[in-house]
């Protein structure tokens, strides 16, 4: 099962596995840039599609956040030449 847009709790994952017999995989997307990251099959972390996307996590001033600190997501799409998305 592929989940997009909402947090899926551990209990929801277990229920989906029990009912449907399927593993739940998270993806991170936006309509304008498409798929940005997909959950790793080995752990719960997401891997960014670095071949076509640059993702930055920044604070309210636009400064890069330290690893693990929450912040705003800025996306630069590296594949869209007709309508570039830069720090969107």
Question: Could you describe each region identified by the protein language model?
Answer:
Residues 1-88:
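Active-site glycine/GP-rich loop and adjacent strand/helix microenvironment
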């Amino acid at each position: 099962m592929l989940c997009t847009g909402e947090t899926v709790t551990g209990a929801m994952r277990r229920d989906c596995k029990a009912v449907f017999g399927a593993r739940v995989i998270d993806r991170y997307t936006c309509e304008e840039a498409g798929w940005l990251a997909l959950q790793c099959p080995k752990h719960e972390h997401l891997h960014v599609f670095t071949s076509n996307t640059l993702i930055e996590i920044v604070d309210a001033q636009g400064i890069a956040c330290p690893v693990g600190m929450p912040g705003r997501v800025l996306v630069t799409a590296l594949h869209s030449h007709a309508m570039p998305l830069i720090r969107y």
